[in-house]
A protein has these predicted regions:
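Basic, Lys/Arg- and aromatic-enriched nucleic-acid-binding interface segment
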Residues: 81-96, 107, 111-168, 172, ...
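Catalytic-site neighborhood detector that most strongly recognizes the C-terminal catalytic loop/helix
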Residues: 131, 189-193, 234-237, 300-326
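Short, Lys/Arg-enriched alpha-helical recognition elements, typified by the DNA-recognition helix
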Residues: 1-104
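Short, polar N-cap/turn motifs at the start of nucleic acid-interacting alpha helices
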Residues: 178-183, 291-311
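DNA/chromatin major-groove-contacting recognition/catalytic segments
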Residues: 140, 197-198, 202-208, 219, ...
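Conserved tyrosine-mediated DNA breakage-rejoining catalytic core shared by Y-recombinases
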Residues: 164, 173-218
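Short, basic (Lys/Arg/His-rich) helix/loop patches that form interaction surfaces
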Residues: 146-148, 222-227, 242-298, 302
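Short, charged hinge/linker segments at domain and secondary-structure junctions
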Residues: 34-35, 46, 70-71, 103-128, ...
Length: 328
């Protein structure tokens, strides 16, 4: 816990570290309870690389142990967020957390055990980002929803996200105060505020509003409260997006992780679309037009050089042809 208190990272990252620490504690108690090692402890000074791999195997299989020993796990009060089958990327993150902790321990003289340096941490693996092409986006925008009026608001919300690249949490918070006289929408992303590290630069977003975005605001703005969109339950919004894209026949096959097996599988786009698909649509299509990450980051809230930004845009063959045309 002392490490979490002293490390200079965001609140979100600290929460991730605490989650890994809790897994370590459950692992120690599990070994004592079910494997007969009554005095088992994973001490920083004495653990071996085999102990670490045994811990990672425990984390990978904890969702199975949770079902088998449910009554025992009740003491940890994790019913609302029980263990699941984790992706390889998540498991690499757990390893990174442990390595960061041990780096801190050795740097500050709390341990001289270098076994953790034998850990191999593989790079994360992601499928290509899932987003709508401009043609698909406009097809959704112009589809006649007269017979499906319940989807009209969801369409406007989703399209607005496609046009300004905001997260759903920011979409719900927008008011007329976010709109400038020169036709921009300005805001500090909620995620940035929640995860801010003291002294770190903020990621203020300023995005021009095109005619489509202005039309959507005009249709939905509450003039009394100033809110740009009425609140809708996020689960209903997520469901509405899928129904909207199904109705609009946005059924191009894409690759995404199966939520149960965690393996990459092919799906029609409408089945895996979420509000975040709109954000990816904004980023990916702008990147095709203007391959300037810093310009795009100024509109999305990503920090320049952000690793996560790479997961939003896809360098396809058209991008490569455009690049080569510049040196012909």
């Amino acid at each position: 816990m002392k490490y979490v208190e002293h490390c200079d990272v965001s609140h979100g990252r600290k929460a991730c570290y605490l989650s890994t620490i809790k897994k370590l504690r459950r692992y120690e108690l599990f070994k004592r309870e079910f494997e007969g090692q009554k005095d088992f402890n994973l001490y920083p000074d004495t653990f071996t690389i085999d102990d670490l791999y045994d811990f990672y195997e425990y984390v990978e299989n904890e969702y199975i142990y949770y079902d088998e020993h449910y009554d025992w796990y009740r003491q940890f009060h994790i019913d609302k967020k029980p263990p699941i089958k984790y992706t390889n990327n998540y498991m690499q993150t757990v390893r990174s957390h442990f390595r960061a902790f041990m780096n801190w321990m050795t740097k500050n003289g709390y341990s001289s055990n270098m076994e953790y340096k034998k850990l191999t941490i593989k790079p994360d693996v992601y499928a290509d980002p899932i987003y709508l092409t401009l043609e698909e986006r406009d097809k959704v925008y112009y589809t006649d929803l007269t017979k499906h009026p319940g989807l009209s608001l969801y369409r406007d919300m989703f399209m607005f996200q496609c046009l300004v690249g905001c997260r759903v949490s920011d979409l719900y918070a927008f008011t007329t105060r976010n709109i400038t006289e020169d036709g921009f929408i300005e805001y500090l992303p909620q995620k940035t505020r929640e995860n801010a590290v003291e002294g770190a630069p903020s990621s203020f977003c300023r995005v021009p509003l095109n005619d489509k975005a202005k039309e959507i605001i005009e249709r939905n703005m509450d003039k009394r409260s100033g809110r740009l969109f009425p609140y809708r339950n996020k689960n209903m919004y997520a469901y509405g997006i899928k129904m909207l894209l199904l109705l609009c026949e946005i059924d191009r096959m894409v690759t995404a992780r199966d939520p149960d097996t965690k393996e990459f599988t092919r799906y029609p786009l409408y089945m895996v679309a979420t509000s975040h698909t709109a954000r990816k649509t904004f980023i990916a299509n702008i990147y095709k037009k203007v391959k300037d990450p810093e310009l795009i980051c100024s509109m999305t809230g990503h920090m320049p050089g952000s690793k996560s930004f790479r997961r939003y845009r896809h360098i396809d063959d058209d991008c490569k042809w455009d690049a080569l045309e510049g040196i012909e």
